């Protein structure tokens, strides 16, 4: 008996087949690119998602020599906050404006003014402060800047829900993804028509069905099943956003467990029995978890793993091509170079703000930079400073959580940043916490498969499914001497943003 988990990421799409023990039987992966038409803009083509998804699923099914009749359900994990706009025939109207896009910063200000004028307490309704990455400001941006497309919108979908629509012909939204629309009543897990009306957004834009993460959106269409080598009629479970799915896939389903994931972005993730509402405007996001009696919270560093990818593509461009020809992994080489630097990278600090910063600074104008370079600075120090800078950005959110009284002494890590032992040690030392990795590396896809198993009736709940499948693999303890060094550098790191904030805004004004 198998379940298929599909993870729609930013850099690519993974399809993972797992069995009832949690063993990954096979995996398929296909890459895709981000389109950046202007500074601060980030888009992807939903049509290309579909092509990439098809390749990933076909690879997983063929590679594992899986009997298609034994795949009992399909579940989703997907990048969050993207908005797919469809016309009345279900055709895509334009590229998806994805989660890292910052174009709607001015619309956030407009929303805040409207809420103040009308007396609507948006924080109590949505459990979030408004961010430019959310649906609501993106829709207002569309109305203002692309009215000819806005007027043709019939339905809007989240990225994973678009794939589910293509697979089943059925449209639905899901409470986890919808939590970051700024249109959901997060405490009550339902659309807030008050928010729609306040912002003059048509209620008809959203699908008629709003589901929990383990509910069935529809059945796999015959033509899709034939193309993918699967059985027609397999139940398709709507799943949830990638961070929620990763939480399920790494066992973050109780209040005393916290996780950190480094992929294209990086996230600190925890859960609670009620929405985590941050009154201090630090962009800590509150969402409905994958089970109806839990909520989760996260702090996002927008371009964390993308920072190392930038190093790969720009600084190590020639080496990348050489390694590709040899069939070797360039990230292992970069990590090896970084390991030659001392703790603290010789005083070189890196701010990972290539496309702005979310938590806790909430600044779309912030940009990446190296600080402390001298003529003696070396490539190992540059590489290590990027890894340290990403960990420092996550520690900022961890400190916000600690200030609320949460005890954080163990963190479950996942994503690309968990594969490097050096990076795990850096995280342990900077977070001053034990770093734990799980037996299944593909957390979001595994979480999607667990939701599929729950939705198809094999497990009675997400908690039961996660407990049955997720296992601890490795633990790294912080090195006390390094913790002391990093505490001092963290103080300097935090001061850099404060001192550069005005300069970031001046720079943004110059290039607009």
Question: Where on the chain are the PLM-derived regions?
Answer:
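Glycine-rich phosphate-binding/catalytic subdomain of phosphoryl-transfer
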Residues: 41, 55-326, 333
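Divalent-cation-assisted or electrostatically stabilized phosphate/pyrophosphate-binding catalytic cores
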Residues: 45
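Glycine/Thr-rich phosphate-binding loops that ligate phosphate moieties of nucleotide
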Residues: 1-29, 35-36, 72-114, 148, ...
């Amino acid at each position: 008996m198998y379940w298929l988990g599909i993870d729609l990421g930013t850099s690519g799409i993974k399809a993972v087949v797992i069995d009832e023990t949690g063993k990954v039987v096979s995996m398929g992966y296909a890459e895709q690119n981000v389109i950046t038409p202007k500074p601060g803009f980030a888009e992807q083509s939903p049509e290309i998602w579909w092509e990439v998804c098809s390749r990933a699923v076909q690879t997983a099914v063929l590679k594992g020599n899986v009997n298609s009749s034994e795949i009992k359900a399909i579940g989703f994990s997907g990048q969050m906050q993207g908005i797919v706009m469809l016309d009345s025939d279900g055709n895509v109207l334009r590229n998806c404006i994805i989660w890292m896009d910052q174009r709607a910063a001015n619309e956030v200000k407009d929303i805040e003014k409207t809420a103040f004028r009308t007396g609507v307490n948006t924080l109590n309704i949505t459990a979030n402060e408004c961010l430019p990455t959310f649906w609501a400001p993106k829709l207002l941006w569309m109305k203002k800047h692309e009215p000819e497309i806005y007027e043709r919108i019939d339905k809007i979908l989240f990225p994973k829900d678009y794939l589910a629509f293509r697979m089943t012909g059925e449209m639905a939204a899901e409470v986890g993804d919808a939590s970051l629309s700024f249109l959901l009543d997060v405490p009550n897990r339902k659309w807030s028509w008050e928010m729609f009306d306040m912002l003059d957004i048509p209620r008809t834009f959203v699908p008629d069905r709003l589901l929990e993460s383990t509910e069935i959106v529809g059945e796999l269409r015959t033509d899709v099943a034939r193309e993918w080598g699967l059985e027609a009629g397999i139940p398709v479970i709507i799943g949830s956003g990638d961070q929620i799915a990763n939480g399920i896939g790494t066992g973050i389903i109780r209040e005393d467990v916290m996780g950190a994931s480094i992929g294209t972005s990086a996230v600190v993730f925890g859960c609670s029995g009620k929405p985590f509402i941050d009154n201090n405007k630090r962009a800590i996001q509150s969402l409905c978890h994958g089970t109806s009696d839990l909520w989760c919270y996260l702090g996002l560093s927008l371009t964390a793993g993308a920072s190392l990818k930038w190093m790969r593509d720009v600084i190590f461009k020639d080496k990348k091509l050489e390694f590709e020809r040899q069939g070797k992994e360039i990230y292992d080489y970069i990590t090896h170079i970084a390991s030659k630097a001392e703790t603290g990278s010789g005083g070189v600090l890196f701010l990972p703000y290539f496309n702005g910063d979310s938590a806790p600074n909430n600044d779309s104008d912030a940009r990446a930079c190296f600080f402390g370079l001298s003529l003696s600075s070396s490539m190992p120090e540059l590489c290590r400073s990027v890894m340290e800078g990403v960990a420092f950005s996550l520690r900022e959110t961890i400190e916000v959580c600690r200030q609320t009284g949460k005890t954080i002494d163990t963190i479950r890590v996942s994503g690309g940043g968990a594969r490097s032992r050096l990076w795990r040690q850096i995280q342990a030392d900077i977070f001053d916490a034990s770093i734990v990795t799980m037996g299944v590396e593909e957390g979001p896809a595994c979480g999607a498969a667990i939701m599929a198993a729950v939705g198809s009736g094999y497990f009675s709940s997400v908690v039961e499914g996660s407990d049955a499948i997720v296992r601890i693999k490795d633990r790294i303890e912080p090195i006390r001497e390094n913790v002391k060094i990093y505490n001092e550098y963290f103080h300097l790191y935090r001061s850099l943003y404060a001192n550069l904030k005005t300069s970031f805004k001046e720079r943004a004004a110059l290039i607009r």
